[in-house]
Amino acid sequence: MPKPSRGPRMCSGPDHERLVLANMSASLFLNKKLRTTEARAKRLRPFAEKLVTLSKRGGLHSRRRALSILRNKAALHELFTNIAPLVEDRNGGYTRITKVGFRSGDGAPMALIELILEPVSARTRGTDTLPDTVIDTGPDSAPDPVPGSEPGSAAGDLPDADTAPADPGESSSNQRVIR
């Protein structure tokens, strides 16, 4: 007997789950964001991203396949005419899930799933993290000298650890004040 392989079902059965995911994705496409439980948002994300990928192909066959899944003509029109051209150059990553706290009634973790429609540029590796000057750390470069260890300096120039106060506000007598 075949068993579900995509994790636990959100609703009573697979047919009802497909209907719930279709309705939630239609709301996501019409409103650009949706507040729901965290588990539902995680189940909705791949479902919605596959529909966006299908809409990027365009064409009548893709439109009819998406309509058979969505069952909402307004959401289908929004998906194919407004959303698909904005994400045409991107390969995935069309949605973002943000945790927003807990529901007041039963304490269920809530999340906001939203479409990422602003253009995202490709990352440039390492150019932002490189320093402006290159520091030579080869075998010829010497480490920075430790203060007091230069030739010609006396060892008595540095204060002793047991005579110097640890805290600037602390007195050197180390007496405790009892109140």
UniProtKB/Swiss-Prot annotation:
Biased composition (Polar residues): 170-179
Superkingdom field: Bacteria
GO molecular function: structural constituent of ribosome
InterPro entries linked to this entry: Ribosomal_bL17, Ribosomal_bL17_CS, Ribosomal_bL17_sf
Region (Disordered): 127-179
Annotated family: Belongs to the bacterial ribosomal protein bL17 family.
Record-linked PANTHER family: LARGE RIBOSOMAL SUBUNIT PROTEIN BL17M, RIBOSOMAL PROTEIN L17
Protein name: Large ribosomal subunit protein bL17
Lineage of source species: Bacteria, Bacillati, Actinomycetota, Actinomycetes, Micrococcales
Gene name per UniProt: rplQ
